[in-house]
Structures are given as C-alpha cells and as structure tokens.
Amino acid sequence: MADMFAPLVAQLKANPKTIVFTEGNDPRILEAAAKLLAEGVLKVVMVGNEAECKAAAAAGNFDISAAEIIDPENYAGFDEMVNTMVELRKGKQTPEECTALLKKSNYFGTMLVKMGKADCLLGGATYSTADTIRPALQLVKTKKGAHLVSSCFILDRDCGEEGLKRIAMGDCAVNIDYTDTIDKATGEVKIAASAKLAEVAIETAKTAKLFGIDPKVAVLSFSTKGSGKGGTVALSHDAVIKAQEMDPELAVDGELQFDAAVAPEVAQVKCKGSKVAGQANTFIFPCIEAGNIGYKIAQRLGGYAAYGPILQGLNAPINDLSRGCNADEVYKMSLITACQS
C-alpha cells in the first residue's frame, strides 16, 4: 500500500464510517468491499438484489457477510424516501417520477446518504459520471456558499531519497470551462467566472490538506504575471484575486506558467518574491482540457499514481469511479471518500 493510505486506514479504524456502494453485484466492488470489511476499516452498505449480490460474491469467493445489502424493491423505508425526494425537488418531479428514480441504485444510494443511513457514497463502476453527480446535486446538494461542484486528483510518486512527493490538481473532470452566470432578470453578472475558478482553488486546497499536503496553490496559464494576453489569462489572474479575497490565509498565486510554478530557478526570473512560485504543490487549471491532459501526463510520463476524481463542494462525500476501474482502485477511492466525511 502506498504511504498515503496508511494514515487513512488508521484514521478510519479509529472512527469508522459507513459507505454505500451503488453497484452491489459488481465483482470489483465486491472484492474491494470484502477487503474493507476484513480489515475493519469501513462499514459497508451494498445496494442491489440480495440474492444477486450474494451469488456474485460467492462466485468470486468474496466474504461480504458483514455488509448490509439493501434492495430498493423491498426496502421498508422506501415510501419515506419518496416523500423526502418529492419535498427536496419542490415540484420539479412528481411522486411517480421520484418513485421510478429511487428504484435506480444511484438515486437510492444517494438518498441513503441524504437520510443519514450512510456517511458517504462511491459509484460509477457501471454508471456514467453524470449519473453519479446528478442525484448528488438534486438530493444531497452543494454546501452552503458553494456555487459549483468541482473535482481534484491527488497524485503521488516515490522520489527515492527525497521521499514521497504528493501534489493536487483541479479541476480535471467536472467543469468544462468557467463562464459568468448572468441574472436573467437584470442582465447583470450574478457569479463571475473568476469567482468559480477561485472556488475550485479553495476547495482543492482543502482536499489537499485532508491528504497531508500543505497547499501552495498555483493558478495556471500559458502566461506568467502578464507575460501573455488573451485566452484564459484574465480568468486565471482574476481568480487569484478572488481567492485571496475569499480566503486571505490561502497561499495562492498566479497567473503562472507551470515551469514558474514548480521550478525555483524559473520562478526567480519570472516572479521573484512570490510565496508560491517555484514551490507549488496544488495546481489549478483554467479549463478541463488542460486539467485532464495535465494529470494524465503526470500519471503516464511522470510516474505519478493518480487518485480521483475526488468531488468537492457537496454536502456529503460522493465520488465517482472510472468504469474501467479495478478492485484496488475501488478500495483506495473508498478510503479517500470516507476520509472526506
């Protein structure tokens, strides 16, 4: 196990959480759940048909006897769930529509979290990212003061004598780009694009802290301190100002090119005196293209292990798996998700 996960395991053994898996009969989920239960790290709720879950577990020789299996089709609290969802949706969906949605494991699992049956949820082994995030937005909703849900990746690499190097990158998976939200009635800017990117920076820094990173946040661009114009330069520049206003204690700077953010010798030339440049460990991208490409370059060419996407801005921890995930990735994302609780 990578060093990153040892303290997470210790933390969770001392303060056990309950996690919901929305795809309870998937072999990868079952293997990870069996390991979590055997280690006594988490309490586990599997959503699905009990007979199917147990048959799939038996086929893989996975012991999930300590897990609770809940089938939406015969759950005693289902009617209460429907009533709660109708109230949450405030006329946007009928009782019949809510009933149909709650028969689906992604909505059902999310409602278990909303109603306090579990602390967190991990899905997406067979669902799309949208099918994991949509119920979360509708039922769990965003935290007070949050304007958007975002994501980050935690990446680490064994650097030999230098030890384990750990960094954070956001947003690499959720927000395609950042535009102003306009008030339809007045035509005025309700939420500036720069405020949204600043929020991503602040939330990514908070996530970084959870996993042992003392965040030094670089808001990235192809420009350093006005060396370039156009594109998203103004967005990155203004986001730094907004982030400093929103969290004066945050160590954040930009706009910075990546070399100025990480290389002290470059920072000395391009932005001397910066408290972040040359030593950044938390990187904020101006659009999803840059973020997604950036973390995958670090993963595939830089030798970093990447964990995520870790969702940010929700009232409860809900995370999304890649449909190409393996059991080890499910296990590790389970630890990460529970530690957000």
Please place each PLM-identified region on the residue numbering.
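Anion-binding alpha/beta catalytic cores of soluble intermediary-metabolism enzymes, centered on
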Residues: 1-277, 281-341
